[in-house]
Amino acid sequence: MPTEYTNLVSALADTGYPCAEYGWKTRPDGTYLVVGLDYEAGRQEGDGAKQDRSFSVSVDAFFAKLSDRAAVAGKVEAALASCLGDSWELNSIQHETETGLFHIEWVGEVFGTITAPPEPEGDA
């Protein structure tokens, strides 16, 4: 994984809010965070391997009380700024009627290399 991404995951974990990569099987009570990196795992190109150099990252914060928005956003944005510099932006703020939670999403870009593993040779 790109270093900026792993640093961001650590920084988000340090906010004091539960944080998971790619979602939760059972949603935590209270405020929680979800972070994810978008890339095409296992895709093969060219000489048998694909190397991407930049990746989209998303951070989602979920919380029950609108009054918590400033505190949550402040901690998440501080983590984003320290790990991604200026390569992020606020994407959306919404209230989800199904869960009753407020949801803020930030998106950004991280740089690095993820090399897809080569396909196994021979018959499996």
Where are these regions (language model features)?
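Long, continuous compositionally biased terminal/linker segments
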Residues: L37-V57, F111-A124
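Acidic-leaning, charged glycine-interspersed low-complexity segments
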Residues: G74-A124
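Oligomerization/assembly interface segments of phage tail-like spikes and tubes
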Residues: Q51-K65, G100-T113
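Small/polar-rich, solvent-exposed N-terminal microdomains that initiate assembly or binding
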Residues: M1-G46, S67, V72-K75, E98
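Residue-level signal for beta-strand positions within conserved beta-sheet cores that form or flank
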Residues: Y17, F55, D86
